[in-house]
């Protein structure tokens, strides 16, 4: 859980110890990044030798983080305190840009009382 935003984000369709009290709907965070000419040249040279292209790995990691931040912001804007079924998608736009989308279902969750948990585990 992100303490700054207090938004729970999971890839599952449930959150252990929580019950979904309201389903708000699909939300997403999108970002598009340009690889840039310099990055393309360095990546092209590195691809000749094989192995990881660290410039692209860092760019994609940073881009995913930005998409996640935007997804958290979207959750807050619609009044959600959790996102379930979190997924990522990516695509190239032209030959120099990459789009990353983080999406999921915005929900409101509450703690499950200990009595309900005991009944469910019996």
Swiss-Prot record:
Family annotation (HAMAP family): UPF0145
Taxonomic classification: Archaea, Methanobacteriati, Thermoplasmatota, Thermoplasmata, Thermoplasmatales
PANTHER family with a match to the protein in the record: UPF0145 PROTEIN SCO3412, UPF0145 PROTEIN YBJQ
InterPro entries found in the cross-reference section: UPF0145_dom_sf, UPF0145_YbjQ-like
Record organism: Thermoplasma volcanium (strain ATCC 51530 / DSM 4299 / JCM 9571 / NBRC 15438 / GSS1)
Protein name stated in the entry: UPF0145 protein TV0671
Family: Belongs to the UPF0145 family.
């Amino acid at each position: 859980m992100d303490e700054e935003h207090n938004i729970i984000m999971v890839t599952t369709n449930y959150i252990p110890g929580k019950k979904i009290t309201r389903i708000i709907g699909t939300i997403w965070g999108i970002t598009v990044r340009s690889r840039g000419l310099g990055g393309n040249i360095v990546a092209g040279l590195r691809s000749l030798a094989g192995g990881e292209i660290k410039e692209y790995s860092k760019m994609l990691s940073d881009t995913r983080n930005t998409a996640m931040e935007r997804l958290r912001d979207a959750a807050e804007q619609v009044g959600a305190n959790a996102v379930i079924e979190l997924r990522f998608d990516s695509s190239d736009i032209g030959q120099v840009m990459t789009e990353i989308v983080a999406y999921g279902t915005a929900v409101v969750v509450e703690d499950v009382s200990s009595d309900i948990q005991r009944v469910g585990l019996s």
